[in-house]
Swiss-Prot record:
Belongs to the glycosyl hydrolase 54 family. The gene is abfB. This is Probable alpha-L-arabinofuranosidase B. GO terms for biological process: arabinan catabolic process; arabinose metabolic process; L-arabinose metabolic process; pectin catabolic process; xylan catabolic process. Its main location: secreted. InterPro entries: A-L-arabinofuranosidase_B_cat (IPR015289), ABFB (IPR038964), AbfB_ABD (IPR007934), AbfB_ABD_sf (IPR036195), ConA-like_dom_sf (IPR013320).
Length: 499
């Protein structure tokens, strides 16, 4: 129950100027960690929200709100990252506890980056506007993860805590585990009840809810719970919102899942009650590390997008969470533009010419299923001209972006598979559609366009030894070489050789 003082404070905190953590503070459940790349989560916060590292020279900078309590300075990011790539290296904790999130280390599973670390996220994969002002979220492909194994002030053992996250309800998969919250400090599986984290996805390996998913569930380690029982719980609905608020809280023999459209409306309670009646979950044995985008022992096959989230000390009341939801809705999250530079038009047929000096007579083509570059001109055979011509269609996974259908093999599209670009028939699956969707941006070398993978926005169409790859600007693969990267990922859009 709230005291008269706290009810007054909560009412004041619900004003437009207050941030989510001001509201939690007024409810006697203060934030112990607060993370966002889009905005300040306290009305007075004016420090760094996140750190960027750019690919051209590996230098770093920090991005702060435009004003105290305001929206991130996206223009500072755009200036710093112009004509190169940028990664998000640190997501800073706004609570003052120093619970910053950095590149997740190896654990029970290795990550795909050097020394088993997880990948870092692209800085431009999740553009949004908040109240009309541009910002960027954290688009996390499989293999991407952030962590802090030495967090301060987070719940341990059976201590009470709450948390929420604003996520993309359309970006998910069924792999383990797109989480945000409390996890093991060793990055290994230390047993049931050692985690308490928000999960969003459509995995049915452990728990699941009504419909086909995705669902908000709670990762308590060795199980995803959608309600009191293992497996199916009908009270946990499928999520269809583009922006979703996921709220979880847990204390001594109680926990809850709540959710809402982050753009409108109020929170609904999907479960509130006793802890699962299975060994290890009552009492809990939480360890207090913080994870984002991965499971507790660095299981890193999941995908999702994160915009903001916090963890609290104490079990927040429904009233407090409801006020936080009002604040999130008032932020007015809207999808931003994924494309820039020379435009494509769905239905047009194009040829794409290499701009790397010494290779400018070569065009993107294919030989059977291999996507490559070949020398093509007006005197080339009809067969080669058709192999070097592509029909532009609306992106199979995202309507802002595009997919490229072969002129000579209708129904087959350029897609990435193990980061090679292949020409494969569209099998109608979600996976294929995501693999075959690419977002054009102004060419990194200033000549034409660069084509960025929608599902792996650190990766671009790149020709390397005359073969096409989905390559990053530096990385563990030979085709990720930084040498000539900007030239190798830039292509001129030309009238097709064939139609």
């Amino acid at each position: 129950m709230f005291s008269r003082r706290n009810l007054l404070a909560l009412g004041l905190a619900a004003t437009v100027s207050a941030g989510p953590c001001d509201i939690y503070e007024a409810g006697d459940t203060p934030c112990v960690a607060a993370h966002s790349t889009t905005r300040a989560l306290y009305s007075s916060f004016s420090g760094a929200l996140y750190q960027l590292q750019r690919g051209s020279d590996d230098t770093t900078t920090t991005i702060s709100p435009l004003t105290a309590g305001g929206i991130a300075d996206a223009s500072a990011q755009d200036t710093f990252c112009a004509n190169t790539t940028c990664l998000i290296t640190i997501i800073y904790d706004q609570s003052g506890n120093g619970n910053h999130l950095t590149q997740a280390p190896p654990g029970g599973f290795d990550g795909p980056d050097t020394d088993g670390y997880d990948n870092l996220a692209s800085a431009i994969g999740a553009p949004v506007t908040l109240n009309g002002q541009k910002a960027y979220g954290v688009f996390m492909s499989p293999g991407t993860g952030y962590r802090n194994n030495e967090a301060t002030g987070t719940a341990t053992g059976d201590e009470a805590e709450g948390m929420y996250a604003v996520l993309d309800g359309t970006h998910y998969n069924d792999a383990c585990c797109f989480d945000y919250g409390n996890a093991e400090t060793s990055s290994t599986d230390t047993g049931a009840g050692h985690m308490e984290a928000i999960y969003l996805g459509n995995s049915t390996t452990w728990g699941y809810g009504a419909g086909d998913g995705p669902w908000i569930m709670v990762d308590m380690e060795n199980n995803l719970f959608s309600g009191a029982d293992e497996g199916y719980n009908s009270g946990d609905p499928s999520i269809s919102y583009r922006f979703v608020t996921a709220a979880v809280k847990g204390g001594a023999d109680k926990w809850a899942i709540r959710g809402a459209n982050a753009a409108s409306g109020s929170l609904s309670t999907y479960y509130s009650g006793a802890r699962p009646d299975y060994s290890g979950y009552n009492p809990m044995s939480k360890e207090g590390a913080i994870i984002l985008g991965i499971g507790g022992y660095n299981s890193n096959g999941a995908q999702g997008t994160f915009y903001e989230g916090v963890m609290t000390s104490g079990y927040p009341s429904d009233d407090t969470e409801n006020s936080v939801q009002e604040n999130i809705v008032a932020a007015k999250y809207v999808v931003g533009s994924l494309v820039s530079g020379p435009s494509f038009t769905s239905g047009e047929v194009v040829s794409l010419r290499v701009t790397t000096p010494g290779y400018t007579t070569r065009y993107i083509a294919h030989t059977d299923t291999t996507v490559n570059t070949q020398v093509v001109d007006d005197d080339s055979s009809t067969t080669l001209k058709e192999e070097a011509s592509w029909t532009v269609v609306t992106g199979l996974a995202n309507s802002q972006c595009f997919s490229f259908e072969s002129v000579d093999t209708p129904g087959s599209y350029i897609r990435h598979y193990n980061f090679e670009l292949l020409l494969n028939a569209n099998d109608g699956t979600k996976q294929f559609h995501e693999d075959a969707t690419f977002c054009p941006q102004a060419a990194l070398n200033g000549e034409g366009t660069s084509l960025r993978s929608w599902s792996y926005p650190t990766r671009y169409f790149r020709h390397y030894e005359n073969v096409l790859y989905a390559a990053s600007n530096g990385g563990v693969q030979t085709f990720d070489s930084k040498t000539s990267f900007n030239n190798d990922v830039s292509f001129e859009i030309e009238t097709a050789f064939a139609s």
